[in-house]
Amino acid sequence: MKDKKIYKIIFIQLGEIYEIFAKQIFQSDMYGFLEVEEFIFTNDDQLVVDPSSEKLKTEFNKVKRSYIPIGAIQRIDEVIESGEAKIKKTS
């Protein structure tokens, strides 16, 4: 059985650093974009909830696929397990 890959994608949007997790990433047919599908978010059963994580869940709630400009991407890692998606201010 082939293991499912999980990717951590870090990119900049509107002066903020987004850190999201997804199961699928592809080079898009649209020149200069990366396709991201099957977003992964942590469970809601935590006692302390990060507001930026909740903002991301709301922002990507009904999104099937997102196209991120290649120039906005800072880093892509293949990780063993997903973490909490978050938004940070750029310094």
Model-assigned labels for residue ranges:
Residues 1-91:
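Eukaryotic intrinsically disordered, low-complexity regulatory linkers and tails enriched in Ser/Thr/Pro
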